[in-house]
Amino acid sequence: MENISDLWNKALAEIEKKISKPSFETWLKSTTAHSLKGDILIITVPNEFTKDWLESRYTRLIEQTLYDITGEELKIKCTIPNHQTTEEFDLKPTSKPRKHDDEQTEFPQSMLNPKYTFDTFVIGSGNRFAHAASLAVAEAPAKAYNPLFIYGGVGLGKTHLMHAIGHYVLEHNPSAKVVYLSSEKFTNEFINAIRDNRPDDFRNKYRNVDVLLIDDIQFLAGKEQTQEEFFHTFNTLHEESKQIVISSDRPPKEIPTLEDRLRSRFEWGLITDITPPDLETRIAILRKKAKAEGFDIPNEVMLYIANQIDSNIRELEGALIRVVAYSSLINKEINADLAAEALKDIIPSSKPKVITIQDIQRVVGEHFNVKLEDFKAKKRTKSVAFPRQIAMYLSRELTDCSLPKIGEEFGGRDHTTVIHAHEKISALIQTDVQLQKQLKEIMEKLK
């Protein structure tokens, strides 16, 4: 085995990809490899609180990561400098270190995270459809949607849903062969099988399962041989009515250098996306996390965190954990001020303001003395129609809203009306100095 410091650094690099930045920096960044005794890797941590937290919440992730890197079943223990020496540990190996055989066809349920179930998944507007589709697949594998393709940004719940499907299937059919793995692990195992001249063992392993859950499929891009292998694996499973669930950070058509025949197969079933959670969902996520971990968090702190962290669930939960850890370490009660202090390193001092269509209507209405309801009315008088066109133009320029959504906010107007307004104002700006001045004033008020 390689030098344990190099091994631990590799493990940290992989773990950093899988958890939120605040969680990584709070619990793992300051850790180092101490020693290796038998099949137990001893990690040095800064204090007792970190030791308890790592051992209770990250053991499974760390040990799985070490296995992915080494192929050996290593256990971890934590030690605190000048607090406990390695000799004081009970270091009897829990099992003899051994390499996993790639041809192994039994897939331990430990590959599934026990915390990722449908019961622990918080449903919101951004994930409702993906949740419903995942539940339908779990209830009737290969009969509802096959394949199910879930895409969305990092930390939004794709992996949670995949694990939840696996748990549900096993709960209702304990003898089912359910496999969860990343496309990177699929690639590495395939390469090892080719190297060791055991391609048939690899094929038998993944073509004889009931449910295949494969995460981050976008990493197959550019890997021609692996794509070829996965293509045939996909075909075999699909023809035998076995369920396939795939996740990605983007839809199939946007994955570069993905073979067309794979892309088309990904589109055979149902494609659903997950978008970032809205404020209400973020608060619900924090409440559920706090309850699960036994944290007593005031509502004002929940609201503060939810308002500050709007990127993804992983960052959101990581921020909550950071606040709790900070409170424990300095022995102070959790409140909004403490939360602000704990999160000052990960929250920008001045977040850019998110401008909404309602903001635009309000400011444009004030500038031109137009009532808000007039923007949605059928009035076509110039005193109303022109400000409405300006508001539509700004909505197109300053928000991420679609044309139909903008039209809906202006009294249910057709998207072609929005296009016409945008084109008209865009043309006028080129020559109308007065309009340029008005738009500048409006935008300054908005920002």
UniProtKB/Swiss-Prot annotation:
Region feature (Disordered): 86-107
Organism encoding this protein: Anoxybacillus flavithermus (strain DSM 21510 / WK1)
Annotated Gene Ontology cellular component terms: cytoplasm; plasma membrane
Region (Domain IV, binds dsDNA) location: 328-447
Annotated region described as Domain III, AAA+ region, given as residue ranges: 111-327
Segments crossing the lipid bilayer: none
Localization of this protein: Cytoplasm
Protein residues bound to ATP: G155, G157, K158, T159
SMART domains reported for this sequence: AAA (SM00382), Bac_DnaA_C (SM00760)
Keyword vocabulary terms for this entry: ATP-binding, Cytoplasm, DNA replication, DNA-binding, Lipid-binding, Nucleotide-binding
Self-association state and partner proteins as the record states: Oligomerizes as a right-handed, spiral filament on DNA at oriC.
Domain comment in the entry: Domain I is involved in oligomerization and binding regulators, domain II is flexibile and of varying length in different bacteria, domain III forms the AAA+ region, while domain IV binds dsDNA.
Biological role: Plays an essential role in the initiation and regulation of chromosomal replication. ATP-DnaA binds to the origin of replication (oriC) to initiate formation of the DNA replication initiation complex once per cell cycle. Binds the DnaA box (a 9 base pair repeat at the origin) and separates the double-stranded (ds)DNA. Forms a right-handed helical filament on oriC DNA; dsDNA binds to the exterior of the filament while single-stranded (ss)DNA is stabiized in the filament's interior.
Protein name: Chromosomal replication initiator protein DnaA
Matches recorded under HAMAP family: DnaA_bact
Gene3D superfamilies in the record: 1.10.1750.10, 1.10.8.60, 3.30.300.180, P-loop containing nucleotide triphosphate hydrolases
GO BP: DNA replication initiation; regulation of DNA replication
Cited NCBIfam families: DnaA (TIGR00362), PRK14086.1 (NF010686)
Pfam families linked to this entry: Bac_DnaA (PF00308), Bac_DnaA_C (PF08299), DnaA_N (PF11638)
Domain of life where this protein originates: Bacteria
Positions of region (Domain I, interacts with DnaA modulators): 1-72
Any GO MF annotation of the entry: DNA replication origin binding
